Amino acid sequence: MAKNQKQTYISPKKFMQTKARTLPIGKCYVNDGWEENGFAIVVVTRIRPSGNLVYGQFLVDTYCLGVKDAFFVENMDAFDFEDAIDKLDSSYQMVEFPYVEAHNLIYGAIAFAEEAGIKPCQDYAFARYVLEEDTDGIPLIEYEYGHKGKYFL
């Protein structure tokens, strides 16, 4: 940084809105067996220049509610990331998941829920910035939503 320049503070929410999508996608995970039980825990990361990660976690109800819970950490080190994945893995058997599949699973569940008038949880408003925008630039993968073709609470 040049002399006499101060580093400006940017809030975590502002960082997510303005910077997160400029970073490369990192590893993504989902709980094994999500197709059978109607809920998925999806983790999406982006890699910061420092090597730390932007971490987004989404609880996705594929039967009805879409994104039930979401949160982000805008600057997570490797130790905390491994710890988070290990904790999830001990309960949910997490497996690596290609980003394009994570993207389609989350946005598809949101679209399905919105057809029933259900919006994503409030925290999705900022956690969503760990995802790419839902555009034609991301190949479309169709998943089945609902239980036996119907909304299921």
PLM regions with names:
Residues 2-153:
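Non-catalytic terminal/accessory regions
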